Curated annotation (Swiss-Prot):
It comes from the Viruses. This is Uncharacterized protein 066L. It comes from Frog virus 3 (isolate Goorha). Residues 1-44, 68-137, 163-183 are annotated as: Disordered.
């Protein structure tokens, strides 16, 4: 016996019209204009919310992806630890013990303030100065600058021995025409 999903005892009766006669649900009413809802400020002005979100959160990942860690207007102010300048001999407010004791012992003063003492400033080579940190070594005319500084420092007695540059000890091939001046 065939199985009818619609178990109708009278197969001659046909179904006319829609199968389910449930009325369609009414569409929801149109949402009110946002300015009508004035009891909540954040929903009253959705177009003017900062950053498109209801709450300003500088740690929000979307905010950080837009503006970075420093915030909207960028980083301001000094970076790193705050360092206050100190007198060279420690605290001069403490009586007696190490009051005016500088790095060279108590009470000793320099003859000239701009004179560098080789015992206080042990400089083995002029190349260990700021021009070494600036990367001037081995670039163009910096060799002339270094030789001039070494010659001046040797004459002033600031350094006792100038390190030899290993680049100068290697034999360089003679290229081109070399002019020999009579002495």
């Amino acid at each position: 016996m065939p199985f009818y999903i619609c178990s109708d005892p009278d197969p001659k009766r046909t179904v006319r019209g829609p199968r389910f006669t449930v009325p369609d649900p009414k569409p929801p009413p149109d949402p009110a204009h946002p300015l009508d809802d004035t009891d909540n400020v954040m929903t009253a002005f959705p177009k003017f919310k900062p950053y498109g979100f209801s709450v300003y959160n500088p740690w929000d990942p979307i905010f950080l992806s837009m503006f970075g860690r420093a915030g909207r207007n960028g980083a301001k102010g000094p970076r790193g630890r705050r360092r206050s300048p100190r007198p060279p001999g420690g605290s001069s407010m403490t009586p007696g013990d190490d009051g005016n004791q500088g790095p060279r012992g108590p009470g000793e003063q320099r003859d000239q303030p701009d004179q560098m003492d080789p015992l206080v400033h042990p400089v083995t080579s002029v190349r260990s100065g700021p021009w070494e940190r600036l990367g001037l070594r081995g670039r163009g005319e910096s060799g002339v600058l270094r030789e001039t500084l070494e010659m001046w420092a040797g004459q002033e007695g600031l350094i006792s021995r100038v390190r030899d540059d290993p680049r100068e000890s290697e034999v360089r091939p003679v290229t081109g025409v070399q002019t020999v001046w009579p002495e």
